[in-house]
Amino acid sequence: MKYVFIEKHQAEFSIKAMCRVLRVARSGWYTWCQRRTRISTRQQFRQHCDSVVLAAFTRSKQRYCAPRLTDELRAQGYPFNVKTVAASLRCQGLRAKASRKFSPVSYRAHGLPVSENLLEQDFYASGPNQKWAGDITYLRTDEGWLYLAVVIDLWSRAVIGWSMSPRMTAQLACDALQMALWRRKRPWNVIVHTDRGGQYCSADYQAQLKRHNLRGSMSAKGCCYDNACVESFFHSLKVECIHGEHFISREIMRATVFNYIECDYNRWRRHSWCGGLSPEQFENQNLA
């Protein structure tokens, strides 16, 4: 209390005089002042942690929650654990973009022949070009729907083929598969798994599979979980860069999706399947 009195009245009286009257040592007063202004080691660590976490969270475009941020920071040399990163996010009021409830799309009969389910929900692949998976989703713009077809290599979860169109046709699926074939140097005997949509059952798509010696596989009727890996990618795409945004044209949506696939998802977005690496990093590490 004496030191508090001195602090309040130091503009009126000299420190020396007040210390003499109150019978306290001037050295004690100065030590007390230093202790009040000194930041503890723990406080310094928290401030440093908060600044580093904020920077990483911003770089991730607010997409990473604590586990992925921890992997990102460890790769940069910061030995933070998940609890520390989670606490920092909580204290700063930072929240990754929230997911939405998954609503499976209903199956529509089309009367076309379907392929046998060769995958049977076994999404593991020991190397590249053993198992691919594809699907189509729809994206809303002010101009109308934009349809996106993708092909994913289940080994690394990399998007190796994609195509976008204002119409959901067999050509959309064929174009995505053609890009995958071009990127992967046209491998043979790959299992290519899709749902039973009319685009994948079409004569054009089936002919493309046969022409390149690919093995077609299709999900069970109405079972979206047979193609869970592609559904998971679409979920990440929509949560991380589409939900909450307003797209006035298909062209803007197209550019956004292209940037997400080619610049973000494949190159640097950390994937739990890849041990915290991005699909591109995983492939480079395992093919070196």
Curated annotation (Swiss-Prot):
Task: Give the signal peptide as a residue range, or say none if absent.
Answer: none
Looking up InterPro entries in the UniProt record yields: HTH-like_dom (IPR025948), Integrase_cat-core (IPR001584), RNaseH-like_sf (IPR012337), RNaseH_sf (IPR036397), Transpos_IS3 (IPR048020), Transposase_IS3/IS150/IS904 (IPR050900)
Q: Which UniProt keywords apply?
A: DNA recombination, DNA-binding, Plasmid, Transposable element, Transposition
Q: Is DNA-binding one of the keywords?
A: yes
The entry assigns this protein to a family as follows: Belongs to the transposase IS3/IS150/IS904 family.
Q: Does the keyword DNA-binding apply?
A: yes
**Which GO MF terms are attached to this record?**
DNA binding
Biological processes, Gene Ontology terms: DNA integration; DNA recombination; transposition
Q: What does this protein do?
A: Involved in the transposition of the insertion sequence IS3.
Q: Which domain of life is it from?
A: Bacteria
Q: Where is the Integrase catalytic domain?
A: 124-287
Instruction: State what protein this is by name.
Output: Transposase InsF for insertion sequence IS3fB
